[in-house]
């Protein structure tokens, strides 16, 4: 009997409470960076019925209207009706942002290497904190992402498209998806075993109508027919009713969907969240760099699966460790890949910022539907412009 395995990942829509918080935090970050690219920002958001609290630490010359940024973001998501219990114009906005700690700033603004005499400009900025970050890529999908999280993101994005276009008029902003994929004995995806979709709706919509629309207009529009069969299970709004949703149903907080933001649990995670943080925070920038490395390694044919770990000490520019794990799929020893990575990629925070051009206001668009593997927007860490350099570096190391 051949061994089959199941793996499940989930995603949530832009109207999920935690994702509302992420988008507000990143909208504030973008607004600040648009005026002050050198700003240091750590903006956290909490949302609940009728209220938004924004708090954290910033260092900037910019002035932004936080109240307006918050309301515009909520309106763009789709919370514009008072009956939702959370609407753009009636919500209470409570900002409480303070100056970044001087003790932290001194290590970020002048790294240990710079203080010890390194005159390289890219050694001037130190890591904003200690920590470990992971990046991953696998050849299961064209975007080199695991199939379960890729499909989960596509499902909730499709729901949002149908809601915003008015094609399914009874949909409301909050939604979740979950996809279970069956793998064969060679770890290749062969079918979708289970799809779970919970979507908020107007009270007049019937369960039968929702089920039919979701299966025909969402699931079958997203998941290739080859992956669906008579044994595929569909759970559509399995509680039977989802009228109360968004912050009226659950509070939301920045940084609570870190697995949705990355690889759906298929790869390890260092624990740091992304949204609301400028690129001196290696939780964010080094995670993007690690994805960039992993994706280019796989695209170069040096492995079919690659996980990259980076780790940093606060106030120090150079990473304390770089590890490449290919799970036995690499064409050369992993030590060779690690040496090649160090040759090709400058992994100091300033090097990452320069390499990926991370001082721009590009972050709000990443705050829903995943930071990795995006095909609908142009993100620098998704580009495959280091493939040739990696191949050549491997040759020099060998």
Curated annotation (Swiss-Prot):
Pfam families on file: S-AdoMet_synt_C (PF02773), S-AdoMet_synt_M (PF02772), S-AdoMet_synt_N (PF00438)
Residues bound to L-methionine: 57, 100, 250, 281
GO MF annotation, one: ATP binding
Segments for region (Flexible loop): 100-110
Residues annotated as binding Mg(2+): 18
The keyword Transmembrane appears for this protein: no
EC number(s) per entry: 2.5.1.6
Binding residues for K(+): 44
Localization per record: Cytoplasm
Catalyzed chemical reaction(s): L-methionine + ATP + H2O = S-adenosyl-L-methionine + phosphate + diphosphate
Example of a GO cellular component annotation carried by this entry: cytoplasm
Biological processes, Gene Ontology terms: one-carbon metabolic process; S-adenosylmethionine biosynthetic process
Keyword Electron transport assigned: no
Residues that, per the record, bind ATP: 16, 174-176, 241-242, 250, 256-257, 273, 277
Coiled coil: none
Co-factor requirement: Mg(2+); K(+)
Pathway it works in: Amino-acid biosynthesis; S-adenosyl-L-methionine biosynthesis; S-adenosyl-L-methionine from L-methionine: step 1/1
Cofactor note (record): Binds 2 divalent ions per subunit. Binds 1 potassium ion per subunit.
Keyword annotations: ATP-binding, Cytoplasm, Magnesium, Metal-binding, Nucleotide-binding, One-carbon metabolism, Potassium, Transferase
Function: Catalyzes the formation of S-adenosylmethionine (AdoMet) from methionine and ATP. The overall synthetic reaction is composed of two sequential steps, AdoMet formation and the subsequent tripolyphosphate hydrolysis which occurs prior to release of AdoMet from the enzyme.
NCBIfam families in alphabetical order: metK
Family label: Belongs to the AdoMet synthase family.
PANTHER family hit by this protein: S-ADENOSYLMETHIONINE SYNTHETASE (PTHR11964)
Quaternary structure note: Homotetramer; dimer of dimers.
Xref: HAMAP family: S_AdoMet_synth1 (MF_00086)
Protein name: S-adenosylmethionine synthase
Gene giving rise to this polypeptide: metK
